[in-house]
Amino acid sequence: MELVFLGTGAGVPSRGRNVTSIALSMLNERKTIWLFDCGEATQHQIMRSQIKLSKLEKIFITHMHGDHIFGLPGLLSSRSFQGGDSTITIYGPAGIAEYVETSLRLSGTRLTYKIIFNEIEPGLIFEDKMFSVIADDLEHGVRSFGYRIVEKDKQGALNAEKLKAEGIEAGPIFQKLKNGEVVELEDGRVVDGKNYIGEPQKGKIISIFGDTKETASELELALNADILVHEATFEGDKGKMAGEYMHSTTLQAANLAKKANVKKLILTHISSRYDRDASKALLIEAKSVFENTEIAYDLAVFEVGE
């Protein structure tokens, strides 16, 4: 899995940063892309990346502020023009369905695919055999969600060396054993596949937050995550201002990462007051509290579990 930061700015686009959108590329895991927020010009950013709209499966909106949703109608329309035909599910706060449907209706846009809207409440909002997604409220003046994406543990690897050491050669039988089946060999031996499968591989956890001030629900959403994506609209000494504007600072994000025992913190939603040089200072500030911190720039790609 990879996180592709399509927009990393706060509020309005700047020369260096577009407004918020993050793609979670799951091509190896499920051959799809999930999108988190869709600020204005997200589709332009996608054209500059390796992301394909045809692979888009789900869109998760954190909150209804314009810098997180104004790119949706255009992106959905372009996907249709490009021949996209698979269903997309959009998750988000109450109002997301009305916003999208009204924009498409008033612009006379007819899509070639179905959209399913899921206006969410805190709790488990999606689960299949591979992943689950949990949402919870943050604190931002308007309703704002954080998302916790949990990859389910994968089956352990088949111990081929152990099998060969016992005179069992590779072939179709290996797949049956990998599936945990009990197999009778030509020589009469009965082999239980479960005895040749290693420990399960722990699935990854990614926590992606919308805009928020410091709030208690953050800890559980972030706990033990492989990657925490957190806004850092302000530098560390502007905690009072951040609270008044319902945003967070670099140090608040870093302290949460440390407390939640995450493996990596990625800062995004950077105010336009901070140019590239000033952004480097933000990173140094956060690293003073939580060393494994990165600051995202537009089109940056991060491997999950790297």
From Swiss-Prot:
Binds 2 Zn(2+) ions. This is Ribonuclease Z. The keyword Nuclease applies. Its cofactor is Zn(2+). CDD domains: RNaseZ_ZiPD-like_MBL-fold. SUPFAM superfamilies: Metallo-hydrolase/oxidoreductase. It comes from the Bacteria. NCBIfam families: PRK00055.1-1, PRK00055.1-3, RNase_Z. It catalyses: Endonucleolytic cleavage of RNA, removing extra 3' nucleotides from tRNA precursor, generating 3' termini of tRNAs. A 3'-hydroxy group is left at the tRNA terminus and a 5'-phosphoryl group is left at the trailer molecule. The active site is at D67. It comes from Listeria welshimeri serovar 6b (strain ATCC 35897 / DSM 20650 / CCUG 15529 / CIP 8149 / NCTC 11857 / SLCC 5334 / V8). Homodimer. GO terms for molecular function: 3'-tRNA processing endoribonuclease activity; zinc ion binding. Zinc phosphodiesterase, which displays some tRNA 3'-processing endonuclease activity. Probably involved in tRNA maturation, by removing a 3'-trailer from precursor tRNA. Belongs to the RNase Z family. Keywords: Endonuclease, Hydrolase, Metal-binding, Nuclease, tRNA processing, Zinc.
